[in-house]
Amino acid sequence: MPLLSCSQTFRLPPLHETFSVFPDNGLNPNYNACRAQSRAWISKYNVQVCGPKMRAFMDNCNFELSNAYVYPYAQPAGLRATMDLANILWLYDEYTDMQTGEDAAKAAVTVSKTLLNPEYDDDTWICHMMRDFYVNHIQKCRPNVAHRFIENFCRYTEVVGTEAKLREKNEVLDIPGYVALRREISAVRTCFDLVEYCLDLDFPDYVHKDPIFVIGYNAAMDLVFWANDLFSYNSEQAKGHAAANVVTVIMTSKKMNLQSTVDFIAGFCEALTFQLLDAKRALSLHEDPTFSRDAVRCLEAFGDWVRGNDAWSFATTRYFGPENKIVKETRIVKLKAPVEESVALKE
């Protein structure tokens, strides 16, 4: 188990300073119109799953705003797709957090059957939601992007079942094992697939297998989930779900206290940032414009994701509640008592 800290607070690192090396491209101007459309769409499904308190909580989190931060360049159709995906992921995550490993595995089967065969219908809300998303967006993607998205989304739902089983056992993985798992359960791969869609790119497999591109891709993906784990740690430890969080993993593996772990994460995020920048520079020297132009543009867009994700985390109440702006200014997080201010799915 992780070492306990006598302190009831911890100080967040200034990740916004680390991520300031990525340009600030502002908010997507299509935000308001796409947000209204996406919220109306997801409401058809969350009303079947969530109680009124949870729906109000999810509305206040404003997940759609995150997409305006991380896809500042997207045209309306692309931005709407990213918002719908974000709403799917948050709803699916909240739903499976309350499921056993067996039930989460059943949900994954429904997702896979639906995405691989849109004619499939088991009359569940998950099936109908995923079929809608496929028809509205994925069938409009170019072929390589569509194939990768389906593969990555199905993999995500399969691994969520693994996470649920670990949660049942309260098992804490080692650092390499957790990083490998988190790259899949974070669903960032599916979000990066939509980066290609929004940029009207359709990379062949050899780009995604290129060692330098992989380094940049993985660095960006890890930056997103390390930051998310850091920001969500307080809520997760209060709900008893912190075993599947990089903070707990490092505390346990390295026998560090909480603040030392947070500082370690800050240093690691700096190293990952340099990896992403170095990969972009290396690809810019490539003779093939698929790499020197298109792959570089994609990594630049991943930088939007990293910086925008950090900015949204303090613009929303998702992680820090109504104190989000105070936490942004002071960087001080007060540890919640168990289940304090936790909203159950059916409430």
From Swiss-Prot:
GO terms for molecular function: metal ion binding; terpene synthase activity. Mg(2+) 3 binds at residues 228, 232, 236. A motif (DDXXD motif) lies at residues 93-97. It holds the Pfam family Terpene_syn_C_2. GO terms for biological process: isoprenoid biosynthetic process. Its cofactor is Mg(2+). Transmembrane segments: none annotated. InterPro entries: Isoprenoid_synthase_dom_sf, Terpene_cyclase-like_2. It is an enzyme of class 4 (lyase). Its EC number is 4.2.3.-, 4.2.3.88. Keywords: Lyase, Magnesium, Metal-binding. Mg(2+) 2 binds at residue 93. It catalyses: (2E,6E)-farnesyl diphosphate = viridiflorene + diphosphate. (2E,6E)-farnesyl diphosphate binds at residues 318-319. Mg(2+) 1 binds at residue 93. Terpene cyclase that catalyzes the cyclization of farnesyl diphosphate (FPP) to viridiflorene and viridiflorol. Belongs to the terpene synthase family. The DDXXD motif is important for the catalytic activity, presumably through binding to Mg(2+). This is Sesquiterpene synthase M422DRAFT_47084.
